[in-house]
Amino acid sequence: MLQVYLVRHGETEWNVARRIQGQSDSPLTAMGVRQAQQVAERVKSAGITHIISSDLGRTCQTAEIIAQACRCDVITDPRLRELDMGVLEQREIATLNTQEEAWRKSLIDGTPDGRIPQGESMVELANRMQAALNSCLALPEHSRPLLVSHGIALGCLLSTVLGLPAYAERRLRLRNCSISRVDYQNSPWLANGWVIETAGDVSHLTDIALDEVQR
C-alpha cells in the first residue's frame, strides 16, 4: 500500500490580507513558518522519503522546513500549483465588483466549467492534480511521499478521489498546514485505487486558524 501525505502551505501575508493568490505569490507570515515547523515535527518520524512541492514560493518555503526535519530534498512539480485565478489574481476580495465576485463564486458553488477569465476551470485543475498524485505510483517500492500544495488544489483532488465532479460545491475546509493522507490499495471493502485516510487534520497546530478569526 502506498501512503501519500498532502499538506497545504503555511499562512501567507496575502491570506491575512484576503488577497487572491492563485498562481501569484506571497511569503509566509511568522505564523505560517511556525505552522510549517509543527508539520515537520509531526511527520519527521513518519518515514517520509520524498518531499514534492508546487513550485510556487509559499509551498517551497513550507516544503523546505518540512524537508529539513525529514532529511529529504525538495522536488518541485508545477502540476501541484494552485488554481490559476486569471484576472482576479492579487486582488483583495473586498474590492471585487458584482461580476467579479460571480466569477470567483463559480469556482466553489458547483457551476460546471466555472472559471475566472484567463484562469483555469476546476476540471483542468483536477486533471493536473490527479496526474501529479498518480506519478507517485512510479516511485520506488516502500516510498512514502509528502506533497505540499494549496487549498483549492488539494480540496479539488480529494473531492475527485471521493468520486465527486471536480466542480462540485466546495465543502471541505483545508486550513493552512493541515495534513491529509491518501492511500493506494486493493481492499475487499473499499474501491480499488486511491482512498482517503484522513483529511484536513490540524491536531498538530497550536495557533487559532486564520479562518476562525476571519469568519
UniProtKB/Swiss-Prot annotation:
Keywords: Glycolysis, Isomerase. The active site is at residues 9, 82. One of its GO terms (biological process) is glycolytic process. It is an enzyme of class 5 (isomerase). It catalyses: (2R)-2-phosphoglycerate = (2R)-3-phosphoglycerate. Its EC number is 5.4.2.-. GO terms for cellular component: cytoplasm. InterPro entries: His_Pase_superF_clade-1, His_PPase_superfam, PG/BPGM_mutase_AS, PGM_Phosphatase, Phosphoglycerate_mutase_GpmB. The record marks 150 as: Transition state stabilizer. Transmembrane segments: none annotated. It comes from the Bacteria. Pathway: Carbohydrate degradation; glycolysis; pyruvate from D-glyceraldehyde 3-phosphate: step 3/5. Substrate binds at residues 8-15, 21-22, 58, 82-85, 151-152. PROSITE patterns: PG_MUTASE. GO terms for molecular function: phosphatase activity; phosphoglycerate mutase activity. Gene3D superfamilies: Phosphoglycerate mutase-like (3.40.50.1240). Belongs to the phosphoglycerate mutase family. GpmB subfamily. HAMAP family: PGAM_GpmB. NCBIfam families: PRK03482.1. This is Probable phosphoglycerate mutase GpmB.
